[in-house]
Amino acid sequence: MKLLILGGTADARHLAKVMHQAQPSLELVYSVAGLVRQPNVPATVVSGGFTQFGGLSTYCTTQHIDGIVNVTHPFSTTMGDHAQQASSELGINYWRFLRPTWQQKAGDDWRLFSTKEKLLRALSGYERALLTLGQVSPKELAFLKSDQHIWLRTAVQPTHPLPSHVNWIKAIGPFNEICELALLKQHHIQVIASKNSGGSATEAKLSAARTLKVPVFMLQRPDIKGPTEENFGALIDRLQAWAETPMAVIT
């Protein structure tokens, strides 16, 4: 039995460790789009996507994959579409874990946006902004004003030159509130731009923003096709049931 984990998140790494411990005979393959850091998982690691293998369906066929569990970032929709299509074509199981969204708390000042363009354009009223949206393309950066002071925080260095008013901060979570408070104070940040990623790894910025009364421009999640599982324990139960009855298609 072989399970392909579409990873790149703390949840995915945790799932790999839990499944290895619970089902030691289950062979695990852990996929990441690119290596920010070598994942410490009890699995064969595949990086760089599946185009190099002729596509996901071809990879699953040649590697005899029996099931796919998608534990990528909540905003990673393309891989999810490919995985769902491949599992349907091949008649293998597919699960999608989607951690719960962050919810506003008392004292929060959130402004909600459906697209990154709308969010970035709305930042024009602020001189000093922290972007925690992941990679931002040159086209998207053009929505910002040249007289703004922007700090772009990502785990991976941008592949394109940044305008002079955009400063890059390399950082990999998890983050804590003390450090987030210090960052906001150091750069006199007036607004934070964030995706509603959910989870605890990057949630500290929201607490820091609440403390300093800094508004958060929150990018809402895209629609996810097909069924999802928000409870991690329930996902583990379903995977274990599948591993113990491999011939069944379990949804």
Q: Each predicted region: which residue ranges?
A:
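Internal active-site segments that recognize and position negatively charged phosphoryl groups
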Residues: 117-148
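Histidine/lysine/aspartate-rich catalytic loop segments that bind and position anionic ligands
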Residues: 143-173
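N-terminal beta-loop-helix "entrance" segment that forms/cooperates
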Residues: 29-51, 108, 161-166
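C-terminal functional extensions of proteins
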Residues: 184-187, 196-199, 205-208, 216-251
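Short, polar loop motifs at secondary-structure junctions
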Residues: 30-38, 97-103, 116, 135-137, ...
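N-terminal basic/disordered segments at the start of proteins
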Residues: 3-22, 28-34
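Glycine-rich, highly charged phosphate/nucleotide-binding loops
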Residues: 43-60, 170-178
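Glycine/small-residue-rich loop that forms an oxyanion/phosphate-binding "nest" at active or ligand-binding sites
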Residues: 57-60, 64-116
